[in-house]
Amino acid sequence: MAVELKETIDKRREEIMDACEKLYETKGFHSITIKDISVETSFSRPSIYNYFQTKEEIFLGLLTREYRKWNIAIAGIIGSNKKLSKDGLAKELAKSMQERKTLLKISAMNLYEIEENSRDELLVEYKRVFKESVEIFDECLKKFLEDTSKSRRQQIRYAFFPYMYGIYPYSYPTEKQISAMDEVKLSHMDVTIYDLTYQFLKLIFGL
């Protein structure tokens, strides 16, 4: 009975997060309300509060889910390849990042506010999954960059994870930002999540 109840709760939380993610594709964080999310789901606004106390907690749950998916993707790289060249590894990691647009967007745009307005236990769960990301990323480096020392792997991690926060804004500048850059004749180019990830990894891998 308890298992069935947990499965029901998890399913409903997933539906709420799915609705939030759908809205986030076309609306900004501050424009999305619990009411908007309820319209996209089968739940009333009061019902949503049975699963999340704040809008920020929904976004934190969504971000946690995104990191879990990324962890699975990196584990897939480790499990399905015996060997990879540095370039091959850069390409595989770039592919995994390309699929995590929502992860990059939340991290770049709204992470601080989301963390501040979520319950401690949910924040701890997010940090636990994030820690797994760091560990599995290091495991990936250790397997495929065999001649790389532990300290060098740490340097790569400390370069790449902060870099991730800048990927989304460069890949998806707003119309207002583009207009302002054009006004001051600041050059800019169309780049993808894949391109930015791949080129940076090549750089820190020494290619």
Give the predicted meaning of each segment.
Residues M1-K11:
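N-terminal intrinsically disordered/low-complexity leader segments
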Residues I9-C20, I37, L62-E66, W70:
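Generic hydrophobic, amphipathic alpha-helix propensity
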Residues E15, L23, H30-E57, G61:
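Helix-turn-helix
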Residues G61, A75-L103, Q154-F160:
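Hydrophobic alpha-helical connector segments
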Residues W70, S85-L104, D190-L207:
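N-terminal hydrophobic signal/anchor transmembrane helix of membrane proteins
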Residues E99-E121, E175-A180:
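Amphipathic alpha-helical segments used for helix-helix packing
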Residues E135, E139, K143, D147, ...:
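C-terminal peripheral helix-coil segments that are non-catalytic and often amphipathic
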Residues L145, S149-R153, R157:
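Membrane-interface starts of transmembrane alpha-helices
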